[in-house]
């Protein structure tokens, strides 16, 4: 447990100790190594990690300790011993004994460690390299042969293991068991034969396996997508946000020569802590896919898409949209800025409220629910919850970081978890959730049967609840009667932001109703428009089934649109904003290439409603954001659209 977590507990007893001659006061239970960090004293370590339970495996953090004048007979691992009253600690900085012990441990760790630094992916950011320099001997006394293993072993399609590099810190095995709940990797054998491996009869199967690569301190675990690709000092790192779900993970994107080489979990104690899922870590190859669209496309007289100039494409799109009845499908991949641009483009440039971000299954009841029943839950509420209810929501599949937060509290406090679903999933099984088994369409009765909720309870609702008439109304009633906190969790990263931006048929930005005259005047004033359309617009399904002549499609995942819907859309004039070729571009008359999240700055809004900003990682990209192209298209139509570019 971190100092921050300890200090937030009520009536925490504070303990004062002395480290290297300096007094420090910390909450009771704080480990010596954390107390030293508070003073700015860095004790070398490999197995220690602030989010994992202490193991004392590597012994690199040995220090001299005495309590009330009585000294321990030998140096102790500072990562396993909590601070006590009257404790005096001497680290390697003030104790020759501790310094000698640390140098001895380092020498033992290096006996069988290979000299792979020249080719190891960890080189340049390796704790073993750094601490061998700062806390090791300047010369090696070892003259024997180092232990050799076959290298590397592919323990999954994404993770490789070099066993001879491993220092047996057990970070990876503790993460798999304590954080992910997937014991997919373990320590085999004992003593000098001990090594990391996977279970013989069980596959290396986890949504979170990439975190073991990031926390490995020595390069024993490496990712296949980054192996032998670059050195840390060759990379330009940019803080970013994950675009794959509504969890809102902080990320770090590493780019070399204008190309993303890897993505790492960023640190945000209030959201993803220091973890992310494998999709967020490795699903970035679409940026350089072979079917990436880099130039505008126009369908010619023979029905083939041909490359065109920007003026030609803008003119063709404007001609098809200007005098037509139009709908706008935004999709859940759009950033907040782009969704706001589509919302403004529909109302100002096209004079219509026919706009919807829900390419998936949806309903009018869902819109009423989202407008009247806002999300009140946060990650902190999950951390304090006594009961978490999952309604048509599988957190491990749909929002992996929410699952980790629930699992953390399940391990810590054995909180109660209930799930309204048709079967027990792998994730709910790990949470030992109570299954309220429900056939499709029976959710209303199941929701009405839930009792015993309180203000400390959290109800998490997935987007699939919109498929059952009355389900979301039952959820609203449950929340009002119990006082429980509510979280609406869509699958896509952009859906919460699209709702806030007014990319729906009956709401303006800020969840203000279309039929509210005052709201229309306020928004029109901000947008510099004389007036806004007053008629409630069409939903996605209504747009597809209508007699509208044209549809603007952007940020939509093609997999969300059914084959029947694509057939109906093919009969309309389609203007597509797309990253790469898809089923939508195959039926479009005009296609505009748009920038990916690494090529533009912007923000997403996570399920809590928290804005997650990110900067462009590839600054020299020639690709334009959706909102910039919308501004150009609005100018071509004849309605000026000024949005943040």
Set out the residue ranges of the language-model regions.
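Generic start-of-chain signal for non-secretory N-termini
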Residues: 1-31
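Fe-S ferredoxin-like electron-transfer domains
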Residues: 2-8, 59-243, 247-251, 256-263
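Short, contiguous pre-domain boundary segments
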Residues: 11-20, 87-89, 293-301
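Short, structural beta-strand-to-alpha-helix junction motif
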Residues: 30-34, 335, 539, 625
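A basic, amphipathic helix-loop patch mediating RNA/tRNA/ribosome contacts
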Residues: 32-66
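Catalytic alpha/large subunits of respiratory electron-transfer oxidoreductases
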Residues: 110, 114, 162-164, 169, ...
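Glycine/threonine-rich phosphate-binding loop and adjacent beta-strand/alpha-helix elements that clamp
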Residues: 598-618
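Extracellular/periplasmic ligand-binding modules, especially the Venus flytrap/periplasmic-binding
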Residues: 620-645
